[in-house]
């Protein structure tokens, strides 16, 4: 998931607005992959290099992750999507880790698309 910040800059938006638009695109991709019965989808969400971004942007990205998990949990259930996270989550703040764990737990018995989020990879 690269280029959201550059896209926003080209359009005259803030970087976080670009990331929010990226969430909308990801939602469409996940829906399509589920619809055509793709079994695994891995989204490279937040790399180790992303920790070098300005603190304000990192906080915005983590808040966007939490909001997206909250907003999409019913859709994940409805569409039988199982959430999995790969990466080193030790750097993620405890609140965000808890929300990730809750979403994983909620979808653990789903057996459709397996959605892997690579975070801090």
List the predicted regions and their residue ranges.
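Flexible, compositionally biased loop and terminal segments
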Residues: 2-121
């Amino acid at each position: 998931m690269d280029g959201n910040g550059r896209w926003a800059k080209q359009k005259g938006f803030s970087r976080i607005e670009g990331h929010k638009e990226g969430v909308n695109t990801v939602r469409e991709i996940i829906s399509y992959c589920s619809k055509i019965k793709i079994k695994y989808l891995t989204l490279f969400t937040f790399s180790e290099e992303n920790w070098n971004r300005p603190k304000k942007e990192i906080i915005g990205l983590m808040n966007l992750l939490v909001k997206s998990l909250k907003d999409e949990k019913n859709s994940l259930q409805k569409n039988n999507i199982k959430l999995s996270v790969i990466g080193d989550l030790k750097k993620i703040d405890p609140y965000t880790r808890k929300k990730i764990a809750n979403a994983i737990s909620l979808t653990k018995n789903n057996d459709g698309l397996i959605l892997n989020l690579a975070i801090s990879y």
